[in-house]
Structures are given as C-alpha cells and as structure tokens.
C-alpha cells in the first residue's frame, strides 16, 4: 500500500476524496508516551507565580501521554488511503 505525506489543503483534499459523502472527523487513534522526554522538564527554569497562575495544569500535563492525530500520522510522517479512511464518519 503506497504511503505519502499529506499536509494542509492536500490532507483535506485527500480526506474528501477518501471519505466522500460520509464526511470525516478528527479522532485520535493512538497514544504516544512522552515519558522519555521528562529529562528535558528538569532543564527548564522554575516558573514564577504569575506564570503558574496562567498555566495551572502544566505540571499535570508534563508527564502525561500525547495523543497522536491525523496531522502527526499523515503530515509529520506518511500515511496511506487506508489510514485516512480511519478518519471518515
């Protein structure tokens, strides 16, 4: 199955082509663990109180998992028409 990178309007056009009248939606299919990146967190300077107030959930999100969506799957990497079909209604 051939794969290619699809970004921006090319990705949208491909979704219209694959999904047709069914339409499409964004729904993350996979989750990626960002635990190995936690060492970089220790290199950041401490936040002042004002920044902590503006981003109260920052620490909770820092060690969480990132959802992998269609842009990461098809633009940052390559995907096939079969992958795209997973985003159809």
From Swiss-Prot:
One of the GO biological process terms: glucose metabolic process
Cellular component, GO annotation: extracellular space
Disulphide bridges, residue numbers: 7-75, 19-88, 74-79
Principal subcellular localization: secreted
MF GO annotations: hormone activity
Pfam assignment, any one: Insulin
InterPro entries: Insulin, Insulin-like, Insulin-like_sf, Insulin_CS, Insulin_family
Record's subcellular location: Secreted
Propeptide: 33-66
Protein known as: Insulin
């Amino acid at each position: 199955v051939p794969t290619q990178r699809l970004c921006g309007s090319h990705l949208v056009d491909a979704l219209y082509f694959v999904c047709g009248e069914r339409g499409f939606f964004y729904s993350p299919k996979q989750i990626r663990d960002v635990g190995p990146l936690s060492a970089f967190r220790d290199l950041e300077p401490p936040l002042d109180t004002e920044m902590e107030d503006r981003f109260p959930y920052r620490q909770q999100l820092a060690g969480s998992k990132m959802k992998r969506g269609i842009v990461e799957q098809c633009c940052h990497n390559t995907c096939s028409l079969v992958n795209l079909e997973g985003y159809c209604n």
